[in-house]
């Protein structure tokens, strides 16, 4: 699958990324390959004057490793970014709806994505599903003081909920924004309606369902690169 990720990352960048763009950079293994290829194109001079806006501490680290400067201050932005490049955990092609957030960065990923003219998703064939929630739970970022209230409310809806726990230390995962993540197992019949509904719960800061109005998907399937 790593080779598929490399192929789609290179294809998407060659096709859609131009010099002088303001780019949002997502989080995850596929984005890692995009950063590596962007670094090559910047060093060769094939791309110039790109500004990068990051979604996580992990992305900042990867950009720094490639000696690519990034913008830390978003407060001066007064217009949308040109393109946000990101991966996905599940993709429903017919609606261009996504699940994101298994890397714990979906709050800032959505801030960057929904404030970009285009959300450019790159993915291998394992990410394509016929219904969201088939393989992955839905990540929900929650304010720590609200987690008990939210878990009770979701349990009353007969949903299967898990507080995401760290593997390397005891206790829950803390996001870059100092919040908790709940993973909710459910099949999503209506992605747009589900996204809007859960955002109404006080204490839920963001849900990992994405329905960007202008999503382009570059993916690998049946031994070829496809677009949706």
From Swiss-Prot:
Keyword annotations: Isomerase
Annotated catalysed reactions: aldehydo-D-ribose 5-phosphate = D-ribulose 5-phosphate
Binding site for substrate: 27-30, 86-89, 100-103, 127
SUPFAM superfamilies per record: D-ribose-5-phosphate isomerase (RpiA), lid domain (SSF75445), NagB/RpiA/CoA transferase-like (SSF100950)
Transmembrane residue ranges: none
One annotated GO molecular function: ribose-5-phosphate isomerase activity
Cellular component terms (Gene Ontology): cytosol
Pathway given in the UniProt record: Carbohydrate degradation; pentose phosphate pathway; D-ribose 5-phosphate from D-ribulose 5-phosphate (non-oxidative stage): step 1/1
InterPro entries for the chain: NagB/RpiA_transferase-like, Ribose5P_isomerase_typA_subgr, Ribose5P_isomerase_type_A
Active site per the UniProt annotation: 109 (proton acceptor)
GO terms under biological process: D-ribose metabolic process; pentose-phosphate shunt, non-oxidative branch
EC number(s) on file: 5.3.1.6
Subunit: Homodimer.
Function: Catalyzes the reversible conversion of ribose-5-phosphate to ribulose 5-phosphate.
Family: Belongs to the ribose 5-phosphate isomerase family.
NCBIfam families according to UniProt: rpiA
Protein name as catalogued: Ribose-5-phosphate isomerase A
Organism: Borreliella afzelii (strain PKo)
Organism classification: Bacteria, Pseudomonadati, Spirochaetota, Spirochaetia, Spirochaetales
């Amino acid at each position: 699958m790593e080779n598929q990720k490399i192929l789609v990352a290179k294809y998407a960048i060659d096709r859609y990324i131009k010099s002088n763009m303001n780019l949002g950079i997502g989080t995850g293994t596929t984005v890692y390959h995009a950063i590596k290829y962007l670094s090559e194109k910047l060093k060769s001079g094939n791309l110039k004057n790109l500004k990068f806006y990051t979604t996580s501490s992990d992305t900042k680290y990867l950009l720094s490793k490639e000696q690519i400067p990034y913008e830390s201050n978003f407060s001066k932005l007064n217009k949308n970014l040109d393109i946000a490049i990101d991966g996905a955990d599940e993709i429903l092609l017919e609606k261009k709806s996504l699940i994101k957030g298994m890397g714990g960065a979906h709050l800032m990923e959505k801030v960057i994505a929904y404030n970009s003219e285009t959300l450019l998703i790159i993915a291998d064939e394992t990410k394509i599903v016929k219904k969201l929630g088939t393989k992955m739970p839905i990540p929900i970022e929650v304010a720590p003081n609200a987690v008990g209230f939210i878990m009770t409310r979701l349990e009353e809806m007969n949903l299967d909920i898990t507080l995401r726990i760290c593997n390397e230390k005891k206790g829950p995962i803390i996001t870059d924004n100092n919040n908790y993540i709940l993973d909710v197992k459910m099949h999503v019949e209506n992605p747009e309606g589900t996204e809007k509904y859960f955002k109404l719960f006080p204490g839920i800061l963001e849900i990992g369902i994405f329905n960007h109005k202008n999503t382009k998907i570059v993916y690998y399937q049946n031994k070829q690169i496809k677009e949706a």
